[in-house]
Amino acid sequence: MSIKKQGLLIVISGPSGAGKGTICKALIEKEKDLKLSISATTRQPRAGEVDGKNYFFKSEEEFKRMIEEDAFLEWAKVYDHYYGTPKEFVLKNLEEGNDVVLEIDIQGALKVKEKFPEGVFIFILPPSMEELRNRIKKRGTESEEEIIKRFKSAYEELNYVSKYNYVVINDDVDRAVEKIRAIIIAEKCRVDRNKDLYLKIREESV
């Protein structure tokens, strides 16, 4: 008889421009069984972003109503916009034994860690601060003032690396994805995640 295991919660975050979204997209393409949680936000869509696929784009009024209804696992205000993780999708999939990936900001990740200390928390770092600035500028979606604001915030966010279980440098997307896949495999083999399994095997041998 197989033992049903709780799904693994994988939280991926890092400063703006570190490449979290690109990494998560490539990870999901390689690991078809992973469930990517879609965040809600009040910011405007960037070029090519689709509502319900990249984000659930909400008005500030809609977002605040969701807060009142306790619909979020976590939420935070970042760069003058609200971001949040809808609760129902995450909890349902974890309970069903599915592994769930959250791509969220650092504020949100730390809130999730308080509720799910057993989760796997991965911090994505750029290869250098110069490269980070170039990536933010290349997006072409922010004014010079916003770029400076994001860059300063990113520098401060590096102080939170020690709150995470793992750090992955995104100097190459494929290499970063392979490191995250290795982390997931290792986490699934941890003794404290397999107690029921080895106890069952031990009982069968008695």
Swiss-Prot record:
Pfam families assigned to the protein according to its UniProt record, in alphabetical order: Guanylate_kin
Keywords: ATP-binding, Cytoplasm, Kinase, Nucleotide-binding, Transferase
Protein name: Guanylate kinase
Group of enzyme by EC: transferase
Organism: Caldanaerobacter subterraneus subsp. tengcongensis (strain DSM 15242 / JCM 11007 / NBRC 100824 / MB4)
Family: Belongs to the guanylate kinase family.
EC identifiers of the protein: 2.7.4.8
Listed PROSITE patterns: GUANYLATE_KINASE_1 (PS00856), GUANYLATE_KINASE_2 (PS50052)
Taxonomy, superkingdom: Bacteria
Domain Guanylate kinase-like: residue ranges: 7-185
The reaction(s) this protein catalyses: GMP + ATP = GDP + ADP
Subcellular localization: Cytoplasm
CC annotations in GO: cytosol
GO molecular-function terms, A-Z: ATP binding; guanylate kinase activity
SUPFAM superfamilies in the cross-refs: P-loop containing nucleoside triphosphate hydrolases
Sites where the protein binds ATP: G14, P15, S16, G17, A18, G19, K20, G21
Name of the coding gene: gmk
General function of this protein: Essential for recycling GMP and indirectly, cGMP.
Keyword Kinase: yes
